[in-house]
């Protein structure tokens, strides 16, 4: 899951070297914290959050396949 978010985010931004994904294991879910450079934040979020929603949808679909609950937070 972590690698999936990283690949998607790196393909969207101008500075792929500044993309970092931190995985936090919770009791019932996995939290993926996506960090990008401030200049690329708009590209990852998109207009009205459409790209962020699309990233979350793709990750959620992959998580369901593995019977897990994953939350993507953009920091």
Swiss-Prot record:
Alphabetically, the GO molecular function entries are:
RNA binding
A Pfam family of the record is KH_KhpA-B
The protein's UniProt keywords, in alphabetical order, are:
Cell shape, Cell wall biogenesis/degradation, Chaperone, Cytoplasm, RNA-binding
Q: How does it assemble?
A: Forms a complex with KhpB.
Q: What gene is it encoded by? A: khpA
**UniProt name for this protein:** RNA-binding protein KhpA
Q: Which PANTHER family match?
A: RNA-BINDING PROTEIN KHPA (PTHR34654:SF1), UPF0109 PROTEIN SCO5592 (PTHR34654)
* Recorded GO CC terms: cytoplasm
Family membership noted in the UniProt record: Belongs to the KhpA RNA-binding protein family.
């Amino acid at each position: 899951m972590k690698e999936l978010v990283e690949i998607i985010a790196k393909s969207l931004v101008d500075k792929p070297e500044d993309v970092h994904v931190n995985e936090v294991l919770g009791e019932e879910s996995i939290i993926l914290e996506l960090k990008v450079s401030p200049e690329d934040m708009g590209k990852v979020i998109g207009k009205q959050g459409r790209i962020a929603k699309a990233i979350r949808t793709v990750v959620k679909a992959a998580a369901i396949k593995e019977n897990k609950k994953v939350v993507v937070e953009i920091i």
